[in-house]
Structure formats: C-alpha cells, structure tokens
Amino acid sequence: LKPFPVPITVLLGVATSSILLSNTKEVLTGYSNTALWLIFAAFALSVAFGKTGLGHRIAYHLVRLFGSTTLRLGYVTAFLDLILSPATPSNTARAAGIVYPINLSIAEAVGSYPGETAKKAGAYLLQNGYFATKVTSFLFATAMAPNYLALDFITKLTGVSLNWAQWAAAMFVPGFIMLMLIPLIGYMYERPSVKDIDNKKIAADGLAELGPMKASEKGLIVIALLAITGWILPTFDIKIDATAVAIVAMIATFVCGIISWDDLLK
C-alpha cells in the first residue's frame, strides 16, 4: 500500500524523528540548514489558506463587520494581512493571492477601475494593501521567507539567538504604529472620492460564493493555531524546534487532505 506520495512519507519520518528524538539538525543534515526547511514547510500553510478559501472568508467577515467606509476598509485589509501573516511566510501569496483579490472586488463593486475611475477607491485600496504587507512581513519571523534566514545569519555572526515570540515582541511596537498610520496617510494622500461602502452586500455576495465553511477550512484553523502555539512555546522554556513544528504542520495539511503535494509544487 502507498497511501501518500513518497515525498510525504519521507517527511512524515523526518517530522516524527524531529519531535520524538529532538534531533532536527541531525535528521536534516543532508538537506541544508533548518531555516530553509522551516520556510519551505511553513509555505504549505500559505498554499492552504489560498486553496481552501479560508483567507477570503476571514476577509469578507472583517469587511462585513468593519468596512463601512473606504478608510475603514484600509484598516480592514491591513489587519487582514496582519491576521494571516504569522502562518503565511510567503508575503506574495498573502498579498497577491488573498488581500489583492478582495481589494479588487471591492474597487470594482464601487465602479473603480484603472484609469479615470481609479481615484474612486481602487488606487487607495491597492496602494494601502501594498504598504501594509511591507509592515506585516517583518512583524513575525514566519511572515516572510527571508526572516528566518536573517535570524540564522545573525546567530552565526553574533551568537545571539531569537525565538519566534522574541522576534514578535521586538517588532510589535514599531510595526503596530506603522500599521495604524499607513491607512490614514494613504487616505490623506490618495483622497478617494467614494467615502461610503455597501460593505454588507459585498460581504454577503463574497460569502455566498464561498458557501458554507468546509471541513478543510476548520482543519486549517486548528493546524495554524497549533503551529503558532508551537512557535511560541520556546519562550516558556519548553524545548521544541520551530522547524519541527513547521514540518509537522505541513504534514498535517497533507494527511488531512487540505492540500496535495502537487498544490505545494505549484
């Protein structure tokens, strides 16, 4: 019997050994450094958020609750990026695959298209999304692929090692201040002509298109929360390797049928 492709079976063995024997470096010694593996493994969560539609569902609920004006929508999309960023190390997948389509659909709903009508809302929303992603990408170590590589270089050069929670604590104040200012400054600069948004209708249409929440979305919520918890635990002197946590999370998305190996390769 071969219930899963060979690469997934191999990774399952790697994950089991890493967790049970705490020998992540030894297990991955032939596969470059652990930082690269963490990035690759956590990328599966980025793919899962896009494939399941969970990212879009979260977005439409935020739009329904808070997006009654263009300025509020700026904050909604910024904080959507913030919510997704701890579990999506690909800021391209996060911004272009989840946040951008939401901004685009809202802009089109108010008749804002590239060209003469861009100033209605589209120019502001898309610019705001771009700059918000730049901030969320450094707020968490797992929010952008190069972050853990940078940590690896810092550790090798200085001997200073930061875990996931320490990185987040160091970046929180400057990051949060910037995230609060970006939508407002962008709004003052772009001055969108459309001020009020029919957010209830936009959200209702979007959620209707997505349909009821699927089992894969519920499973992804559990996996993402457990992964983030695993990355935080070393702060409390609980020895668990961040790379091992990421690999287990990736394996869980495969085993639960949330994504396939081909989805990850794409």
Model-inferred region functions:
Residues 4-114, 262-266:
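Membrane-embedded alpha-helical segments and adjacent helix-loop junctions characteristic
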Residues 51-54, 91-95, 110-212:
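Juxtamembrane and boundary regions of transmembrane helices in multi-pass small-molecule transporters
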Residues 71-78, 122, 126, 216-225:
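Short hydrophobic alpha-helical membrane-embedded segments
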Residues 1-4, 80-90, 130-141, 230-236:
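Transmembrane alpha-helix interface/packing and boundary motifs in multi-pass membrane proteins
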Residues 1-38, 156-158, 166-266:
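Hydrophobic transmembrane alpha-helices of multi-pass small-molecule transporters
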Residues 76-77, 128, 170, 248:
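Hydrophobic core positions of alpha-helical segments in small-molecule transporters
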Residues 42-49, 83, 87-90, 135-138, ...:
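Hydrophobic alpha-helical transmembrane segments of multi-pass membrane proteins
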